[in-house]
């Protein structure tokens, strides 16, 4: 009886470990950068499962939730997944996953290779490291080498560059998709912190998408109204000479994407003259 119990117990353990195991020793690298995540990847049925945000952000896909259904979009690709279902719809065509997406500790786990390759990235596994190479981000057919952001402070300023393709594309799309109504140029606007007055618009940050030679492909400047109770943000496109209303939520989304890009090692400080 004791031997029988031991055999049954061992078989039970083998079943558990073969279906799901923690991939604690596995590192995920995107374009050479080690990705930080608050939930460990898991191996389930020989598939690497990762938190949805880890993979979606790094391949530049936008996520939309509706009940237990998640929709990922990027350019002309649209993918619909459901929790606890192996059915997936890609641009209207049904396919089937080897492993169903699932929720664990308030994180949605999805098959990493499927999501990465669907959105144009290639995946390689070697020596406990999963390497994802993302598809280059382009604007009007020109490859974006970096997103440069420049801030002027009370004393000095900071210039940084982000080279994460997925993050840069998500930031660009946030600008494009959240343009409000066209407005006239403000009567007074400045980037000089010492000469801004109540009612003036101050440039908070300048975003410049650069090509491989460091030339500007597209630039966006964000201005905010100073010294008055109402919060108003304007988006300026210098090349077109056009101004738009822009939302605080969209601005915060951009800053959050930059924070996560920095956390994952994609942001480099080019210069910092602040004391």
What name fits each language-model region?
Residues 206-256:
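Extracytosolic low-complexity repeat regions of secreted or lipid-anchored proteins
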Residues 4-7, 15-188, 202, 216, ...:
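Primary recognition of N-terminal secretory signal peptides and signal-anchoring hydrophobic helices
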């Amino acid at each position: 009886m004791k031997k029988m119990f031991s055999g049954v117990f061992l078989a039970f353990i083998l079943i558990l470990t073969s279906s799901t195991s923690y991939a604690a020793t596995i590192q995920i690298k995107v374009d050479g950068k080690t990705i930080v995540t608050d939930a460990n990847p898991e191996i389930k049925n020989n598939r690497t499962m990762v938190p949805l945000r880890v993979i979606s952000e790094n391949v530049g896909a936008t996520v939309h939730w509706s009940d237990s259904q998640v929709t990922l979009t990027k350019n002309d690709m649209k993918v619909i997944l459901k929790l606890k279902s192996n059915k997936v719809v890609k641009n209207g065509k049904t396919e089937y996953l080897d492993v169903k997406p699932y929720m664990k500790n308030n994180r949605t786990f999805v098959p990493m290779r499927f999501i990465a390759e669907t959105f144009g990235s290639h995946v390689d596994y070697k020596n406990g490291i999963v390497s994802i190479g993302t598809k280059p981000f382009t604007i009007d057919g020109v490859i974006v080498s970096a997103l440069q952001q420049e801030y002027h402070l009370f004393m000095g300023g900071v210039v940084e560059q982000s080279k994460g393709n997925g993050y840069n594309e998500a930031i660009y799309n946030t600008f494009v998709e959240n343009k409000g109504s066209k407005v006239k140029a403000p009567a007074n606007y400045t980037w000089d912190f010492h000469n801004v007055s109540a009612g003036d618009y101050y440039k908070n940050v300048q975003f410049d998408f650069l090509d491989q030679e460091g030339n500007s492909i597209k630039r966006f400047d964000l201005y905010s109204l100073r010294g008055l109770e109402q919060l108003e943000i304007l988006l300026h496109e210098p090349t077109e000479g056009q101004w738009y209303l822009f939302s605080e939520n969209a601005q915060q989304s951009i800053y959050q994407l930059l924070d996560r890009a920095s956390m994952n090692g994609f942001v480099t400080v080019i210069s910092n003259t602040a004391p």
